[in-house]
């Protein structure tokens, strides 16, 4: 009986230590979530201004003819897949990877028809183990990434489209809704849809050296900015999912502690009752 009580006590201590860790991880994830939300908000005006200028140029007769705005016969498709480097984030990685695999299976019959640009160690390991065709990868991103952290892989993907090595490019990530809701999303990045110009707020710009050259310079930057915006959303989704997972783990640990504490108290009561019974039996035997 004493051995069983000691084991329950050790188990309670272990669960309390685990609860302390998961509670701390939940708080850290909440702080990182807010940081990435703020960063996404800060980056939005830059993307909006580029979009405004592109819409102004593309509304002209020559702008919409740029190759990055034109559909062409699809021989090969590229996918930029955003995952995390770390686990303990609930279904964050599994959900987007399942979505990507289903999309690939529906659209392609051969591995020659597509290639994957992967961000995050979890995605890299997943696709590598299953021999999916990887075109480029980046891992080890900071929890609050800067644009420079993904400039290389985003630029490489856009360059392959411009060089007609791929004919369409999709962006795959967990779209942030709230801390408890993230939507696995696969959306077309290239060819870009020309942003619609708001005539009520239209501004007449003068472009040097020409509107066509400005557009040619801005479109790749705009595509890369969309990748960065998706990355920030994905990071917010990751921390939201991790915060929820750690919150659930903390609640489960509390439930286990309560059940173990009840078992511990019952075991102690049984041990005390048995000890009293033995004392009484011994006293009666001496009488």
UniProtKB/Swiss-Prot annotation:
GO biological processes: proton motive force-driven plasma membrane ATP synthesis
Top-level taxon of origin: Bacteria
Bilayer topology term: Peripheral membrane protein
Role: Produces ATP from ADP in the presence of a proton gradient across the membrane. The gamma chain is believed to be important in regulating ATPase activity and the flow of protons through the CF(0) complex.
GO molecular function, one term: ATP binding
NCBIfam families: ATPsyn_F1gamma
Record keyword Nucleus present: no
InterPro entries per UniProt: ATP_synth_F1_ATPase_gsu, ATP_synth_F1_gsu, ATP_synth_F1_gsu_CS
Keywords: ATP synthesis, Cell membrane, CF(1), Hydrogen ion transport, Ion transport, Membrane, Transport
HAMAP family: ATP_synth_gamma_bact
Family note: Belongs to the ATPase gamma chain family.
Alphabetized Pfam families for the sequence: ATP-synt (PF00231)
Assembly description: F-type ATPases have 2 components, CF(1) - the catalytic core - and CF(0) - the membrane proton channel. CF(1) has five subunits: alpha(3), beta(3), gamma(1), delta(1), epsilon(1). CF(0) has three main subunits: a, b and c.
Gene symbol of the encoding locus: atpG
Chief place of localization: membrane
Entry protein name: ATP synthase gamma chain
GO CC annotation: plasma membrane; proton-transporting ATP synthase complex
Compartments, record wording: Cell membrane
């Amino acid at each position: 009986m004493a051995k069983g009580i000691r084991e329950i006590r050790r188990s309670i201590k272990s669960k309390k230590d685990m609860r302390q860790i998961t509670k701390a991880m939940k708080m850290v994830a909440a702080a990182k979530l807010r940081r990435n939300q703020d960063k996404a908000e800060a980056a939005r005006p830059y993307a909006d201004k580029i979009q405004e200028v592109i819409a102004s140029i593309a509304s002209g007769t020559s702008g919409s003819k740029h190759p990055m705005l034109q559909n062409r016969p699809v021989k090969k498709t590229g996918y930029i897949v955003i995952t995390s480097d770390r686990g303990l984030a609930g279904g964050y990685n599994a959900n987007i990877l399942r979505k990507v695999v289903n999309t690939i299976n529906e659209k392609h019959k051969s591995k020659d028809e597509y290639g994957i640009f992967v961000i995050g160690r979890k995605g890299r390991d997943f696709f590598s183990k299953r021999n999916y065709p990887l075109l480029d990868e980046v891992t080890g991103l900071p929890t609050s990434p800067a644009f420079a952290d993904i400039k290389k892989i985003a630029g490489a993907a856009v360059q392959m489209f411009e060089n007609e090595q791929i004919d369409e490019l999709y962006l795959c990530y967990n779209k942030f809704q709230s801390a408890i809701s993230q939507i696995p999303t696969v959306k077309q990045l290239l060819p870009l849809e020309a942003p619609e110009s708001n005539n009520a707020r239209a501004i007449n710009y003068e472009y040097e050296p020409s509107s066509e050259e400005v557009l040619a310079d801005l479109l790749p930057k705009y595509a890369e900015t969309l990748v960065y915006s998706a990355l920030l959303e994905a990071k917010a989704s990751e921390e939201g999912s991790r915060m929820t997972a750690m919150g659930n783990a903390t609640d489960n640990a509390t439930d286990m502690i309560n059940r173990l504490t009840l078992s511990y108290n019952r075991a102690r009561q049984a041990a005390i009752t048995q000890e009293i019974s033995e004392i009484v039996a011994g006293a009666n035997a001496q009488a």
